[in-house]
Amino acid sequence: MSDRILVLVRHGQSEWNLKNLFTGWRDPDLTEQGVSEAKRAGALLKAEGLKFDVAFTSDLTRAQKTLGLILGEMGQEGVPTTRNVALNERDYGDLAGLNKDDARAKWGDDQVHIWRRSYDIAPPGGESLRDTVARTLPYYVQEILPCVLRGQTTLVAAHGNSLRALIMTLEKLSPEGIMKRELNTGAPIVYKLAADSTVAEKRDLVA
């Protein structure tokens, strides 16, 4: 049986990350730094000798482009890829497009902190992390995990909060634990899964 390898990568820096804006389902492109981060992720994964069988990404440009740059850097452009809205970033609703400092000025530091860092309180018109988990986790269980358990080396390029939903499940973290987890842009996390889908090994790849 082949190793059951799952790699998670948060997209490279986007134009709105750089401008300190709430992004959510809005669709900014990568910055030059974001492109470099994605290529560096590809180089790190290539150095590991990984050959991907399948890949998954969201419906948003920054994640799709990150995936394409990673696979291009690895010389694996032909990997079958599935795009799905289930892997989209958390929807920030009325906060989307706002500068985070401006949002704090409008609603107050405490309220914005609650929206950003509580598990189950959503901003106006948006999703909480719990809502994001409810959207993302079934897709992981039904579509992504079966590929990994079949021995297909699997790459997921997505977003900070949709990946938090997967990491929470993989690492059996509490809501409080996952809210504290910071994911760097363009930094691959490599999981080796046991036959029962638990994590046998985890490594963070850094340049």
From Swiss-Prot:
Catalytic activity reads:
(2R)-2-phosphoglycerate = (2R)-3-phosphoglycerate
Residues carrying the site annotation Transition state stabilizer: 159
Q: Name one GO biological process term.
A: gluconeogenesis
- Give the residues annotated as active site: 11 (tele-phosphohistidine intermediate), 89 (proton donor/acceptor)
Which terms are listed as keywords in the entry? Gluconeogenesis, Glycolysis, Isomerase
Q: GO: which molecular function terms? A: phosphoglycerate mutase activity
* Pathway(s) where this gene product acts: Carbohydrate degradation; glycolysis; pyruvate from D-glyceraldehyde 3-phosphate: step 3/5
Class of the enzyme per the UniProt entry, highest EC level: isomerase
Keyword Isomerase attributed: yes
Instruction: Report whether Isomerase shows up as a keyword of the record.
Output: yes
Q: Which CDD domains match?
A: HP_PGM_like
Q: Name one Pfam family in it.
A: His_Phos_1
**Alphabetical list of Gene3D superfamilies matching this protein:** Phosphoglycerate mutase-like
Family in the record: Belongs to the phosphoglycerate mutase family. BPG-dependent PGAM subfamily.
What this protein is reported to do is described as: Catalyzes the interconversion of 2-phosphoglycerate and 3-phosphoglycerate.
Q: What is this protein called?
A: 2,3-bisphosphoglycerate-dependent phosphoglycerate mutase
